[in-house]
Design a protein with these regions (language model features):
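C-terminal "cap" of GNAT-fold acetyltransferases
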Residues: 121-143
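A short, internal acetyl-CoA/4′-phosphopantetheine-binding micro-motif in the GNAT/acyltransferase core
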Residues: 63-79
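Conserved acyl-CoA
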Residues: 79-93, 102, 111-113
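Conserved beta-strand in the GNAT
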Residues: 42, 46-63
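Short amphipathic alpha-helix that is part of the acyltransferase structural core
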Residues: 1-25
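Active-site rim helix/loop that mediates acceptor-substrate recognition in acyltransferases
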Residues: 19-39
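Charged interaction scaffolds used for protein-protein
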Residues: 37, 45-46, 59, 137-143
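Conserved beta-strand-loop-alpha-helix junction that forms the acyl-donor binding cleft
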Residues: 93-109, 120-124
Length: 143
């Protein structure tokens, strides 16, 4: 719960704008709800700052909200995010992202997501990009 409060009160402006303008949702309420569900993780950087939270909702809907701390250790953050995504068992991970959120677009590309199409979404009818990643099947090794 503490991480949810920290992330919500320190969101990157682009992330706050995406949640509020694009989805019509209060970031604090959303993060607290997800923290209570227990379906999320948070990322802490070497300087002790919380860089963000991420989670997987029903049907493989993946989400992430970040603080400016991601810019302090961008490589560390990207590797931690990749570890999280690669650890997931869902066959398909997907969602939409505000096309103005260029940092997240770059991260999604690094994480192996493919951009599918532009859609108009939310109360302000903003342009979002649908993205998805089909998880690689892990082969079982035998002796």
């Amino acid at each position: 719960m503490e991480a949810a409060l920290e992330v919500a009160s320190n969101l990157r402006p682009e992330d706050r704008r995406e949640v509020e303008e694009g989805h019509g949702t209060n970031p604090l309420g959303y993060l607290i709800r997800e923290a209570r569900r227990g379906t999320c993780v948070y990322f802490t950087m070497p300087n002790g700052k919380t860089a963000g939270m991420a989670g997987i909702e029903d049907e493989g809907v993946v989400w992430m909200l970040c603080t400016p701390a991601i810019h302090d250790y961008p490589i560390t953050f990207a590797r931690e995010a990749k570890r999280f995504i690669d650890s997931r068992q869902e066959e398909l991970l997907w969602n939409i992202v505000d096309e103005r959120n260029t940092v997240h677009l770059k991260l999604l590309k690094f994480l192996g997501f493919k951009f599918l199409r532009r859609i108009i979404h939310g109360p302000n009818k903003l342009s979002f990009i649908e993205f998805a990643r089909v998880q690689r099947k892990r082969s079982k090794r035998s002796c």
